[in-house]
Amino acid sequence: VIAPGVLARTVSDYTHRRPSESPTLAPLWQTLAQHAKAGACHHRGTCPLVTVGPVVVNEHHEVPMVRGGRAPARLPEARLTEGFDTLTEAAFDLARALGVEQLWIQPGCEDPIQLHTARADPQDGDRMRVAVRYLVRTHAALCHFAPGAPQVWTPLTEVDLELARRVDSFMASGAR
């Protein structure tokens, strides 16, 4: 199980590297502080929903997007579940479950590349969703999506321009 302190440290480290994003992540940070103080969650389903996901970039600068019914395609992410000690491990497991068998972390990019905030899906209630995203690399030929699978390669610039700029910067410099 990913310890609450691991998530708190991840958010803290991320906001120190990107102070301009601190106001957006403040509700999550406040909730984590309240949980630590109380020793548990007493918010009855109103806490920010935290998910984790890989931003899998191939040699063509494309990422696999997941389509789901009528909903628009989006970057893969999943709720935190039992069995993982780190957020990175959970992101890698999701990538492998999608058919990305051979993947590696871009050198210098061991920390999340993005903490993406959005409104949670309707079935999750009226609350914030925070996707902890890790940059991982692969080659398209090493991915084995099942026939009819919901994954589709999409140019990163069509997904999220800010994320594309951040990925370009990381890949060019290896800097945090």
Where does each model-flagged region fall?
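Actinobacteria-biased recognition of intrinsically disordered, low-complexity terminal regions
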Residues: 1-11, 173-176
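Acidic, metal-coordinating catalytic segment for phosphate/diphosphate chemistry
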Residues: 13-53
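Short acidic (Asp/Glu) patches
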Residues: 36-40, 51, 87, 116-121
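Short connector loops at helix/strand junctions that flank enzyme active sites
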Residues: 47-52, 70, 75, 127-129
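Conserved Nudix-box catalytic region and its N-terminal flanking loop in Nudix hydrolases
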Residues: 59-100
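Active-site segment of metal-dependent pyrophosphate-handling enzymes
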Residues: 96-142
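NUDIX/MutT-family hydrolases
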Residues: 133-174
